[in-house]
Amino acid sequence: MKLIDADPIGINVCSTVATYANVHDELRKVYAKLPDAKKAGYKAGDFSYNTGKLRCPTCDGTGVISLDVQFLPDVEIPCPDCHGSRYNGDAGHIKRKTKSGELYSLPELMDMDVQQVLQACEDMKKIGSRLQILQDLGLGYLTLGEAGGRIIAKAIPEKIACDRGSITGKYLR
């Protein structure tokens, strides 16, 4: 028996729908193999929010800046440099051609919802199967880059989806 509660899905501030669904690692590997990434010397780890060379240095890959408002709770605003994408400008230059001929960078994919990414990554079976579970449970509207800590009420069906499809391979809390 597994307990599925309403806690946010995010383990840390860099957790997203893509990391929780375990597709971010796959996407990073795909983008690291592209000719432009190889030419620039990027590896899969460089596309990480946590430590990668391509993460935004201003917000440290969180996509937000916290403003200290005296006597009130801190206010989070989108990062003025990456505009919430979590990546620096160089990441936008590494683009992958889809089956339909469109070009997308990893930051652009992370800004898309599950339904859009399913179409853009239709030639990637592993990613498609993991995202299809979310889509089937009515979560196609979630963006891949949506912060995991902000998804609370939506987390229950996402946890079920991830458990059902063994997306994370871990027991849920």
Model regions: which residues?
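Conserved phosphate-binding elements of NTP-dependent enzyme cores
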Residues: 1-173
